[in-house]
């Protein structure tokens, strides 16, 4: 009867595999005796079964998503909001920065909402990651536009020139260390240039698709073009507008927002110093500022952001909510939002930054000439008051607990 040999893996010759097995089993008397008895095929079959089970397992690291994959992974369907929100309408946004410094709120992960004011808070807190969560899909596109500008610009002057569609007529390096007031004056005396805007849009779109890996639909391109052309048309005079009414006079222009200061009179906008701008530029280049589409009270986005932060071994340092809570209370979805906040990884130092619009009820922290009051609150205190059933109205949210900043 002809003996059939056990087939071996094609990647190794019988002699090679047998030699490996002899070395691996030299301390096993039983297997050594089998090898010496001429029963090598049986030994080969035995070891092919046993050795994989005895081999130490190597931990497989989870696959890190790309920037584009992470956006898609965290986002929900977009929703409607009755304004374009091309710029902030919160003039007093810097008034809490000195208190953030005093409380030593640094690092961790930042979560925010809305357009450019987030960059000032990120520059102040210096987080490892930042997530911008907004119900409007257009906000995500606007932050992709900003991300491309950060990547393309070498310094603040080039960034501001591309943002406002006003090309620099002199060597741009001259403005690398200018004050924000100098940069504002430069833009005031530089006319918009439609060819420059068109060229910038081409570079921005190419950067978003080729470098960031985010595909743009024709509608996306139109939305980004609308953003760029709005800033080019209005320049430093652009301000927040609602779809249902003309801009309120108390809403600040971009010029005012850029020149605003903290309580000590120090300009703290993200374009106030080259060092702050370069920090943001590095974060953007490292894909660490991630725009996400979703509802604060939705079933997925905020919780998914929290899960991702937890997977990084990080906690939330600051959650900037603007005045979104007002709309959540109007829509009877505030409880769902609070339940989402409860799932975020946090510490006793984690803070909420909110914008309080009194609607007839002034806040003790309100400043003369400022329509909106910016407030700080411990995230744990927010959760405690919510669980105690204390938040019945919007005014409860703003007035029951806050950290004095003055």
Model-derived segments and spans:
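Alpha-helical subdomain
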Residues: 235-406
């Amino acid at each position: 009867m002809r003996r059939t040999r056990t087939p071996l893996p094609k990647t190794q010759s019988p002699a090679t595999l047998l030699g490996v097995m002899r070395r691996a089993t030299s301390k096993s008397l039983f297997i050594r005796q089998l090898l010496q008895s001429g029963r090598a095929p049986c030994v080969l079959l035995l070891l092919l079964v046993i050795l994989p089970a005895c081999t130490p397992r190597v931990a497989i690291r989870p696959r890190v998503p790309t920037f584009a994959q992470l956006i898609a992974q965290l986002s929900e369907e977009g929703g409607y909001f009755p304004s374009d929100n091309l710029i902030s309408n919160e003039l007093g946004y810097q008034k809490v920065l000195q208190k953030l410094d005093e409380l030593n709120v640094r690092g961790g992960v930042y979560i925010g909402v809305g357009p450019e004011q987030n960059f000032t808070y990120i520059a102040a807190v210096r987080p490892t990651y930042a997530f911008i969560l907004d119900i409007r899909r257009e906000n995500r596109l606007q932050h992709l536009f900003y991300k491309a500008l950060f990547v393309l610009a070498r310094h603040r002057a080039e960034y501001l020139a591309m943002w406002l569609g006003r090309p620099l007529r002199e060597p741009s390096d001259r403005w690398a260390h200018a004050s924000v007031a100098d940069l504002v004056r430069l833009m005031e005396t530089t006319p918009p240039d439609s060819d420059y805007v068109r060229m910038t849009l081409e570079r921005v779109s190419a950067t978003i698709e080729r470098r960031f890996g985010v595909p743009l639909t024709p509608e996306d391109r139109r939305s980004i073009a609308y953003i760029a052309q709005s800033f080019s048309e209005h320049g430093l005079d652009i301000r927040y507008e609602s779809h249902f009414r003309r801009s309120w006079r108390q809403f600040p222009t971009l010029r005012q927002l850029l020149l605003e200061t903290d309580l000590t009179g120090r300009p703290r906008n993200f374009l106030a110093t080259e060092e702050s701008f370069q920090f943001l530029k590095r974060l953007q280049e490292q894909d660490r500022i991630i725009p996400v589409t979703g509802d604060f009270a939705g079933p997925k986005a905020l919780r998914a952001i929290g899960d991702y932060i937890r997977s990084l071994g990080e906690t939330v340092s600051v959650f900037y909510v603007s005045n979104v809570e007002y709309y959540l209370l109007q829509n009877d979805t505030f409880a769902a939002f609070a339940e989402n906040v409860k799932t975020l990884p946090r510490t006793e130092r984690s803070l909420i930054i909110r914008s309080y619009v009194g609607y007839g009820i002034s806040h003790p922290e309100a400043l003369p000439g400022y329509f909106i009051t910016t407030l700080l609150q411990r995230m744990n205190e927010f959760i405690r008051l919510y669980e105690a059933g204390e938040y019945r109205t919007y005014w409860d949210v703003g007035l029951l607990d806050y950290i004095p900043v003055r």
